């Protein structure tokens, strides 16, 4: 499969970025499910993409997860939320997917739907 991650204009590029972000989030959720977590989806506009929860030795393991693909960076609000989590002793994980891994997954393992 041959795919292009560059749009011809800013509107098209924003649409591509949104789809790539959703795909990255789906990959991260699948990985967390494989580790035994339950996924809690949140509304858009939150400081993180989803929360992952599991019980370990009768204790609740809660992780706030922010997923970024390629060269994407966290916003100021997300960085502030990450710092707040660190101060509060709460788990926050930045799940980064390099472009090479995304390309591999798109070519070999997963259905990317209308991204093609």
Question: Model-derived features: where do they sit?
Answer:
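Domain-level recognition of nuclease-like catalytic cores that cleave nucleotide substrates
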Residues: 15-19, 76-83, 90-116
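Conserved catalytic cores of phosphodiester-cleaving nucleases, focusing on short active-site segments
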Residues: 28, 32, 50-52, 58-71
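Ordered hydrophobic segments in well-structured contexts
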Residues: 38-40, 51-53, 62-64, 91-93
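Glycine-centered loop/turn motif at secondary-structure junctions
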Residues: 36, 86-89
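Active-site-adjacent loop/helix micro-motif of nuclease/hydrolase catalytic cores
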Residues: 42-43, 71-80
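Acidic-basic catalytic patches of nuclease active cores, encompassing PD-(D/E)XK
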Residues: 1-44
């Amino acid at each position: 499969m041959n795919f292009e991650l560059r749009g011809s204009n800013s509107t098209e590029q924003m649409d591509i970025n949104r789809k790539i972000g959703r795909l990255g989030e789906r990959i991260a959720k699948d990985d967390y499910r494989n580790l035994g977590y339950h996924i809690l989806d949140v509304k858009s506009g939150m400081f993180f993409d989803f929360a992952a929860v599991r019980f370990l030795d009768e204790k609740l393991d809660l992780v706030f997860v922010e997923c970024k693909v390629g060269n994407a960076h966290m916003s100021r609000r997300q960085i502030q939320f990450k710092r707040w989590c660190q101060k509060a002793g709460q788990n926050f994980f930045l799940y980064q997917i390099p472009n090479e891994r995304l390309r591999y997954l798109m070519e070999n393992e997963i259905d990317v739907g209308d991204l093609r």
